[in-house]
Amino acid sequence: MGFLSGKRILVTGVASKLSIAYGIAQAMHREGAELAFTYQNDKLKGRVEEFAAQLGSDIVLQCDVAEDASIDTMFAELGKVWPKFDGFVHSIGFAPGDQLDGDYVNAVTREGFKIAHDISSYSFVAMAKACRSMLNPGSALLTLSYLGAERAIPNYNVMGLAKASLEANVRYMANAMGPEGVRVNAISAGPIRTLAASGIKDFRKMLAHCEAVTPIRRTVTIEDVGNSAAFLCSDLSAGISGEVVHVDGGFSIAAMNELELK
């Protein structure tokens, strides 16, 4: 019996088998969780249904987090099969491509700023608000962040601001929902080659640098993140809330390791 046996968890953001969300879903399935999934549009529906079936689930629901009505409809549909459940994984982030290249001050626009914060940060609390009455005591909400929330990363630009907003969201949500027995955390994952990451200029160079200077001398995998996510959504982490847990091989704690390469 796995340490998530008896838990019902909704997973968003599965786009391919390279997705961090897929690694999370795999780990949660292995540990006995019953899973449900969302997809953004019809283009992704068949793919997500296939992945869900591989992980023992037939609950696959459409949800566009840019629309409150879509979020409400999704949870209404979920409530027909799960009147109560035990949390969700928010693995959603987006900024227009022209915002993720070059000088931040020159690249950022009012519209790009709004879109990045709406999709990448506000959607997390919007989902929590919509399903609050459905969450069992002991539930856990989890989102995915990145070091760009704390440091200026080349080409990450407005997404760094959106992730900083998301991390603040985690703290405020944890404080607000804690009395109901709901925990809220984030994982700040190291760079991983995913479809989303491919939109960041020079991402391969970032990966190579990270691998060379990270204390464990490798980049993390979706399995690494998945295992940590399963723990954070389980009762094993019952005392952890409002935290941003770095799953990056120690990259975020090191300085000047590049000197060893010269």
Curated annotation (Swiss-Prot):
Q: Where does substrate bind?
A: 95
Q: Which Pfam families match?
A: adh_short_C2
Q: Which domain of life is it from?
A: Bacteria
Query: Consequence of mutating residue 205 to A?
Result: No effect on substrate reduction
MF annotations from Gene Ontology: enoyl-[acyl-carrier-protein] reductase (NADH) activity; identical protein binding; NADH binding
Alphabetized InterPro entries for the sequence: Enoyl-ACP_Rdtase_NADH, NAD(P)-bd_dom_sf, SDR_fam
Residues involved in NAD(+) binding:
13, 19-20, 40, 64-65, 92, 163, 192-196
Q: Which GO terms describe its cellular component?
A: catalytic complex; cytosol; membrane; protein-containing complex
Q: Which GO terms describe its biological process?
A: biotin biosynthetic process; fatty acid elongation; lipid biosynthetic process; protein homotetramerization; response to antibiotic
Q: Which residues catalyse the reaction?
A: 146 (proton acceptor), 156 (proton acceptor)
Could you say what the effect of mutating residue 159 to T is?
Answer: Triclosan resistance
Q: What is the effect of changing residue 93 to S?
A: Diazaborine resistance
Q: State the family named in the UniProt similarity comment for this chain.
A: Belongs to the short-chain dehydrogenases/reductases (SDR) family. FabI subfamily.
What task does this protein carry out? Catalyzes the reduction of a carbon-carbon double bond in an enoyl moiety that is covalently linked to an acyl carrier protein (ACP). Involved in the elongation cycle of fatty acid which are used in the lipid metabolism and in the biotin biosynthesis.
Q: What is this protein called?
A: Enoyl-[acyl-carrier-protein] reductase [NADH] FabI
